[in-house]
Curated annotation (Swiss-Prot):
Keywords: Acetylation, Cytoplasm, Ubl conjugation pathway. It is found in: Cytoplasm, Myofibril, Sarcomere, Z line. The keyword Methyltransferase does not apply. This is F-box only protein 22. GO terms for cellular component: cytoplasm; nucleus; Z disc. It comes from Mus musculus (Mouse). Disruption phenotype: Fbxo22-deletion mice are almost half the size at 6 months of age as compared with WT mice due to the accumulation of TP53. Other mutant mice died within 2 days of birth. Substrate-recognition component of the SCF (SKP1-CUL1-F-box protein)-type E3 ubiquitin ligase complex. Promotes the proteasome-dependent degradation of key sarcomeric proteins, such as alpha-actinin (ACTN2) and filamin-C (FLNC), essential for maintenance of normal contractile function. Substrate-recognition component of the SCF (SKP1-CUL1-F-box protein)-type E3 ubiquitin ligase complex that is implicated in the control of various cellular processes such as cell cycle control, transcriptional regulation, DNA damage repair, and apoptosis. Promotes the proteasome-dependent degradation of key sarcomeric proteins, such as alpha-actinin (ACTN2) and filamin-C (FLNC), essential for maintenance of normal contractile function. Acts as a key regulator of histone methylation marks namely H3K9 and H3K36 methylation through the regulation of histone demethylase KDM4A protein levels. The modification N6-acetyllysine is found at residue 193. Residues 18-70 form the F-box domain. The modification N-acetylmethionine is found at residue 1. Directly interacts with SKP1 and CUL1. GO terms for biological process: cellular response to starvation; nucleocytoplasmic transport; positive regulation of proteasomal ubiquitin-dependent protein catabolic process; positive regulation of ubiquitin-dependent protein catabolic process; proteasome-mediated ubiquitin-dependent protein catabolic process; protein polyubiquitination; regulation of myotube differentiation; regulation of skeletal muscle fiber development.
Length: 402
């Protein structure tokens, strides 16, 4: 989605009146441009100064979060992962210019079965090739954060009211595209476990908005390669540095970090660490609920959703997140699938839902809306934030569209 280089004039056979209108009347040009996707707008921005200014104004009006998802229907082709193919096609028609992208894909096909059995060099090459292919589809200035997990939760493209799908096994993925939103700052962060230096400097946390930031509202946090020695303790150490603030904290443990374009050095697929996104801005409202082990049928799941509904988070311009344990899902609900995602849809009919099945969950019951906080972070013990055999459901509202 890069701007095309310079201009190209209008053909001499063009109607002179049309040429005059499209070269001089900004209102008309802007109206025409509202029908074009972002990629086409970036191409025509190089034609002349008038068109460039019109493109800038039109893109400023496109501020809604967009998503691209790939599920069972898109899987099964031999030419690469389904998410790469679907993103390449869908970006031709996306109307926003993404500034930050969060994508998640299933581990089994993003990293092939043969490579998972121990061919480390092949695994590293394949993982990075797939991740690089995906990253190259987005603008160079776009910050891309990508992780791979055992299972994926996606809402099909087209409408936020589409039925979300819990895909516990199989090729799948999604990409959340965040444009630049007035009054909201989204920052990726990454802390790599270094056995020689486990100290987290205050400036590292401040630079990514996790400390000394009165507008911090939400942190999505993910520990990767947590099966390795010391990795889980490192995740606890990182989270403890900002968990006592009045913010929403949600996430979990995933298999691997596959993309982080803001990093200067190539990612080491065998490293362990903590990665995520911080959301800052007074317009943000958010809430989370924890579905504990005793939430094990449709009735108790719906009771949890009622608690989330009671937070009264606006549904417009809101994203739902579901971070579940791999031990839940189909087998946990006595061979009944999609129980939690369906319950979410029942109570939030127009909010798209995304997430994963992972190896541990982070979060608790909490509401952050304006100056009101239910169950302040400093009232929650650290062990109450880390769970297994649970699900974290979260709502993140990014302000009313202007």
């Amino acid at each position: 989605m890069e701007p095309a280089g310079g201009g190209g004039g209008v053909s001499s056979s063009t109607d002179p009146r049309s040429t005059y209108v499209l070269s001089n009347l900004a209102e008309v040009v802007e109206r025409v441009f509202t029908f074009l996707p972002a990629k086409a707008l970036l191409r025509v921005a190089g034609v002349c100064r008038l068109w460039r200014e019109c493109v800038r104004r039109v893109l400023r009006t496109h501020r809604s979060v967009t998503w691209i998802s790939a599920g069972v229907a898109e899987a099964g082709h031999l030419e690469g992962h389904c998410l790469v193919r679907v993103v390449a096609e869908a970006l031709e028609n996306v109307r926003i210019l993404p500034q930050t992208v969060l994508y998640m894909a299933d581990s089994e096909t993003f990293i092939s079965l043969e490579e998972c059995r121990g061919h480390k060099r092949a695994r590293k090459r394949t993982t990075m090739e797939t991740a690089c292919a995906l990253e190259k589809l987005f603008p160079k200035q776009c910050q891309v954060l990508g992780i791979v997990t055992p299972g994926i939760v996606v809402t099909p493209m087209g409408s936020g009211s589409n039925r979300p799908q819990e895909i516990e096994i199989g090729e799948s993925g999604f990409a959340l595209l965040f444009p630049q939103i007035e009054g909201i700052k989204i920052q990726p962060f990454h802390f790599i476990k270094d056995s020689k230096n486990l100290t987290l400097e205050r400036h590292q946390l401040t630079e990514v908005g996790l400390l000394d930031n009165p507008e911090l509202r939400v942190v999505l946090v993910f520990g990767y390669n947590c099966c390795k020695v010391g990795a889980s303790n490192y995740l606890h150490r990182v989270v403890s540095t900002f968990s006592d603030m009045n913010i929403i904290l949600a996430g979990g443990q995933v298999d691997n970090l596959s993309s982080l374009t803001c990093e200067k050095n190539p990612l080491d697929i065998d490293a362990t660490g903590v990665v995520g996104l911080s959301f800052s801005g007074h317009r943000i409202q958010s809430a989370t609920v924890l579905l504990t082990e005793d939430v094990n049928d449709a009735k108790t799941v719906e009771a949890a959703m009622q608690r989330l509904k009671a937070a009264n988070i606006p549904e417009q311009n809101t994203i739902g997140f579901m971070f579940a344990c791999v031990g839940r899902g189909f087998q946990y609900y006595r061979a009944k699938g999609n129980v939690e995602a369906d319950a979410f849809r029942k109570f939030f009919p127009s909010v798209p839902l995304f997430g994963f099945f992972g190896n541990g969950e982070i979060g608790c019951d909490r509401i952050v809306t304006g100056n009101f906080i239910l169950r302040r972070c400093n009232e929650v013990k650290e062990e109450d934030l880390f769970h297994s055999y649970t699900t974290i459901m979260a709502l993140v509202h990014l302000g009313t569209s202007k």
